[in-house]
Amino acid sequence: MEAPEYLDLDEIDFSDDISYSVTSLKTIPALCRRCDSQNEDRSVSSSGWNCGVSTLITNPQKPTGIADVYSKFRPVKRVSPLKHQPETLENNENEDQKNNTVEYQKGGETDQGPQPEELSPEDGVGGLPGKGSEPSQALGELEHYDLDMDEILDVPYIKSSQQLAPLTKVTSEKRILGLCTTINGLSAKTCPIASTENSTPNMTPFCVLSPVKSPHLRKAPTALRDQHKLSTEDSESSPALGKCGPAYESENHSKDFLNKVFSDPHSRKIEKSGPDCKLRSFHLQSSAAGAKTEEPINGMNWTNTQGTEERTEYLKKVRSILNIVNEGQISLLPHLAADNLDKIHDENGNNLLHIAASKGHAECLQHLTSLMGEDCLNERNTEQLTPAGLAIKNGQLECVRWMVSETEAIAELSCSKDFPSLIHYAGCYGQEKILLWLLQFMQEQGISLDEVDREGNSAVHVASQHGYLGCIQTLVEYGANVTMQNHAGEKPSQSAERHGHTLCSRYLVVVETCMSLASQVVKLTKQLKEQTVERVTLQSQLQQLLEAQKSEGKSLPSSPSSPSSPASTKSQWKALDTDEESTGKSKVGAQEGIQVLGSLSVSSRARTKGKDEDSDKILRQLLGKEISENVCTQEKLSLEFQDAQASSRNSKKIPLEKRELKLARLRQLMQRSLSESDTDSNNSEDPKNTPVKRADRPRPQPIVESVENVDSAESLHLMIKKHSLASGRRFPFGMKASKSLDGHSPSPTSESSEPDLDSHGPGLGMTPPTQPSTEATQSSPDSTAAQKVATSPKSALKSPSSKRRTSQNSKLRVTFEEPVVQMEQTGLELNGEKDKDKGRAPQRTSESGEQMKRPFGTFRSIMESLSGNQNNNNNYQPASQLKTCTLPLTSLGRKTADAKGNPVSPASKGKNKAAMYSSCIHLPSNALVEEHLRDYARHNDIKRNATKTYHMKHTAEPEPRE
């Protein structure tokens, strides 16, 4: 049964000694039988054993060449043949003793399996000296070979447990036979039991030493080995080994080996090997059946021997794997391919993943994870740490990154029932960088930072208990809750204090304080926002109410002739109230506007000289022919502005009859005002100034004085400030006023004043509404006139749409060379149109603003309208005053500017309105104003007559007025 040479080579490797091989030659047939039977018993592949037997036979046939062949074929062993070698060697060499020895070694090696390292050195020490010089030499070679081949070559190809066992069995049998023959004289039968035993232990270590043995043992069924180990260990005692040991001095090495084995937990195996050796010698002498019976015993002994060998080999392999993983040498791992990598643990209970992670070998960790499976990532060592936890403890960020982001270890970011989360470990071990990365990752994944462990400790608690301030700061930066209490009722600051970490405790106290303050700030800010929103809504509601009241005032059926009509007065006073409410907010704007009116009355004169020049040129053109009328209209405008606002609001609702009555009234008033335009303008300015004084008393009073004393331009400024439309400077405000006044205009002013306004309208554009306030007829004609100013004064007066267009464009276009009287007449005609155009009032307002530059005549009409429509003025003064307040801002000096800027932006209008409201608030009642206006008209008729000419001059020459 000759096996291939590679098998022979394997066999040769096992039979290190030539003499041993020779002995095996003699016993080859029996050995072959035994090997076959043993192979069957051992569940080792019979084919392998048969091959081994044949090769063994051939090898013994080459007694002298065996050593050479062995040495020659070591490289071959290094190649795959080792797998087959164990089988051939066992079968070829002494069948009986081989089998016995093989089994014996199986038992020993299986026990030794965990101690392969120990076995190898032991083999080197005591292996062959007992056998003889040749065997010892062979053993030396084997030792060398065992160290190199077993650790390096055999491991990759042969499973240490299976192959090593059969190999050791074969070698042990061969060596036992060889030793028996050598020592006892080729015949194992003659050898005493002791000698056999001694030789056997020697051989056993030798067999253990041979790498081929270990692979054979590996090949041998591990179960049988284990059984043999158990039985032999139990049955065989150390004394048997002792017998084996002392039997031979040559075996002193073997004794040493045995002693080593004894010292090792595999001493039992060695002991087993000793009695096995005895049995083996007997069996060698006895029949194959006896040998077979010995096989189980020998096998057990062998198993012990193999157990020791296998253990040593296994331990060697494990240690080598652990070393490789420790060093992160991934390239060496495939050569150590083991079926049970996941069962390899070090003394601390760390599996390979623990080791790789703790050492920071990310690539090795990934490779091992692919080999072992991710389930191993959940294993915990003696410290109850997973590979991820151990990596955190050792600060291996890359490994933590990979495990958390790519494997199931992400589950460890959350606390489990029994174990804390990874950030707990990071805080516990003070790993700030890892903690930072974990927090970032958790933030991205939406994982809570405040999870607690079994004791209710959050990561902040753990970090504070261990005094890692940096970790605490990192956690705080990422929003960890520092006020949480654990199950003991401690906050992190208290835990830090209790553990003596005062710095951390202080920091946490500061953070708690800041957090509480911040929360309060947030609450206050939220409340402030809510209140601000409410305030804004209230303001908007107030504005809506004011607008509604204004529109109601415009649409109020109460005629301006009935100034005391409760609806109009109520609406006015409501507007005033709302204005007052808003004035709280807009007081600043109103006061500023009034102050501006005061200062602007002077400064605007200088500033608006250019504008006034332009507007004055227009006024000159418009007023040049009818300056007296213009003066009257200005006066009327100043009075009518308020009246027109009130009346314009009510005029829409006012029946046509009332409007006609008002128109007739206004015509009379206009006639009066024409005669008394100067005095009316002064008077109207004065009474209006008085309310203006109420609005802004300090400035209005000097303004009033200046109005009376100053040129009609100054009086117009005062008028404007006093809600008089006389001054074109009011026009930006007056436009608004005039718009509302246009709405009210139907009754207030006479046509004459309106034409004046219209004539002024081109320049003032805003006065027409003021005139309408005096008389609806006038206001409408004024607005229409202003509109005409844009297009043609007559056509504008005739068509409300043209009025609207002109009112917008008339500011600069207002150049009515036509007599103002005609304008006023057209205004009377257009009063009805203005009533229609009251909705168009905003457009007219620009015209009225322009007209306001003219309002000298309008002031007359205003005075008249005040006398006739004082009630209306009272009702509508709030609006008119709002507008007039803006008008005073635009004093005569501003008339030109306003004439240019008659299309005052609604914002400025709003401001003007606010100012007017404030002035209205301060104004006692329009009745008082009207009385003042009447008084002024009476007392100042002469002055105004004088000033009419003066106003006419100013209207013709606005600069001189300033």
Curated annotation (Swiss-Prot):
ANK repeats lie at residues 348-379, 383-412, 418-447, 455-484, 602-631, 698-728. Ubiquitinated; mediated by SIAH1 or RNF19A and leading to its subsequent proteasomal degradation. InterPro entries: Ankyrin_rpt, Ankyrin_rpt-contain_sf, SNCAIP, SNCAIP_SNCA-bd. Keywords: ANK repeat, Coiled coil, Repeat, Ubl conjugation. Residues 685-699, 831-840 have a biased composition (Basic and acidic residues). Residues 554-571, 667-684 have a biased composition (Low complexity). Pfam families: Ank_2, SNCAIP_SNCA_bd. GO terms for cellular component: cytoplasm. One of its GO terms (molecular function) is identical protein binding. Residues 522-548 form a coiled coil. Residues 80-99, 104-137, 222-249, 548-590, 667-852 are annotated as: Disordered. PANTHER family: SYNPHILIN-1 (PTHR22882:SF3). Associates with SNCA, RNF19A and PRKN. This is Synphilin-1. It comes from Mus musculus (Mouse). The lineage of its organism: Eukaryota, Metazoa, Chordata, Craniata, Vertebrata. The gene is Sncaip.
